[in-house]
């Protein structure tokens, strides 16, 4: 949950030889179960107090959960951005409007250790960007801190507390 120090850290890469280890494979299974039980569409390892560069996501109802390890994202600026109304399992009951790229190139290892590169669009791209932010110690609420700092104390008092 918000306030936990692991959520603000830049996560460490997973060594390639560790991807198929029992520890990582068990963590993957546990994260998928946790994500589904919470009704989420994504969950990053830092959200379960593991500061490693991995997340799971299930942006489509009838597809299997995807495992994304050591991802890199290239933002496709020419495709433009859009406002995304997002919730986060680390900030229950709150939603934030965040500007996201419509299209990204995503490179990562899957749970079998295979290297994958693909172009992601739409909701899948948004979920990937949200979870990727977690790997860099960024929460959706962080996008609003610079705005809040410029408000008067009276205006800040009107903002709901997390």
Where are these regions (language model features)?
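Active-site rim/adjacent substrate-binding subdomains
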Residues: 1-129, 133-162
């Amino acid at each position: 949950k918000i306030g936990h120090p692991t959520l603000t850290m830049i996560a460490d890469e997973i060594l390639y030889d560790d991807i198929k280890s029992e520890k990582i494979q068990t963590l993957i299974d546990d994260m998928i179960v946790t994500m589904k039980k919470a009704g989420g569409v994504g969950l990053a390892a830092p959200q379960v107090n593991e500061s490693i560069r991995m997340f799971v996501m299930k942006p489509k109802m009838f597809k299997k959960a995807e495992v994304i390890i050591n991802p890199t994202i290239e933002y496709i600026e020419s495709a433009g951005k859009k406002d995304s109304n997002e919730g986060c399992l680390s900030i229950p009951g709150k939603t934030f409007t965040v500007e996201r790229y419509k299209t990204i190139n995503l490179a990562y290892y899957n749970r079998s250790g295979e290297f994958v590169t693909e172009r992601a669009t739409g909701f899948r791209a948004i979920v990937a960007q949200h979870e990727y932010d977690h790997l860099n110690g960024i929460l959706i609420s962080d996008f609003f801190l610079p705005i809040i700092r410029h408000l008067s104390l009276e205006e800040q008092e009107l903002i709901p507390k997390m």
